Structures are given as C-alpha cells and as structure tokens.
C-alpha cells in the first residue's frame, strides 16, 4: 500500500445524546472535540440515534395502521364527492 494516503484509524467516543450512552469505537472520523473517559482522552462525536435508541433495535416500534386505497381516497377527496344518490 502507498504510504501517507490512508486516514488515521483510532478509537473514538460516540455519544448518543438521546439516551446518554457512550460508545468507544474504532473510526477514521475527524473531530476537534475531545472527552476523557477512564483516564484516557479520546476524540468525541455526538450522534442523535444509535442502536441503543433506534426503535428497530429497542423493540419499541411504532405501528402504523395500514389503510386500503379506497379508504385513503375517501379520506383525501371525500369532501368533494357527493353522497346523494340520483342527483
């Protein structure tokens, strides 16, 4: 491999702010922020969603009631369609 073309691979702390969890993961992400954990200073990155907070991984899925095409049509355009027969 060519020297000096690969990014620096290092341990980085990712902070999931929605559940206040910290993850130490190897990464090449660049950041100017740092945090000290366990007496060691690491690069620090905040994230909004991780496997600890995403509904798919936590099992707290939101269920969306599925409607048929006719029900959706009636909901959207029902006010324009006359309900009187033989008019």
From Swiss-Prot:
Gene ablation phenotype (knockout): Grows poorly in the absence of zinc.
Biological process terms in GO annotation: cellular response to zinc ion starvation; cytoplasmic translation; translation
Keywords assigned by UniProt, alphabetized: Ribonucleoprotein, Ribosomal protein
A GO term for molecular function: structural constituent of ribosome
Inducing or repressing factors: Maximally induced 30 minutes under zinc-limiting conditions, still induced in stationary phase; repressed by the zinc uptake regulation protein Zur. Probably part of the rpmE2-rpmJ2 operon.
GO cellular component terms listed in the entry, alphabetical order: cytoplasm; cytosolic large ribosomal subunit
PANTHER family with a match to the protein in the record: 50S RIBOSOMAL PROTEIN L31, CHLOROPLASTIC, LARGE RIBOSOMAL SUBUNIT PROTEIN BL31C
Family membership noted in the UniProt record: Belongs to the bacterial ribosomal protein bL31 family. Type B subfamily.
Subunit annotation: Part of the 50S ribosomal subunit.
Name of this protein: Large ribosomal subunit protein bL31B
Source organism of the structure: Escherichia coli (strain K12)
Gene: ykgM
């Amino acid at each position: 491999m060519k020297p000096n073309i690969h990014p620096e691979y290092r341990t980085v702390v990712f902070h999931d702010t929605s559940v206040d969890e910290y993850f130490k993961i190897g990464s090449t992400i660049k950041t100017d922020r740092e945090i000290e954990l366990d007496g060691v200073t690491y690069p620090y990155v905040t994230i909004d969603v991780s496997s600890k907070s995403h509904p798919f991984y936590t099992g707290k899925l939101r269920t969306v009631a599925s409607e048929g095409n006719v029900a959706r049509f009636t909901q959207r355009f029902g006010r324009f369609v006359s309900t009187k027969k033989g008019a």
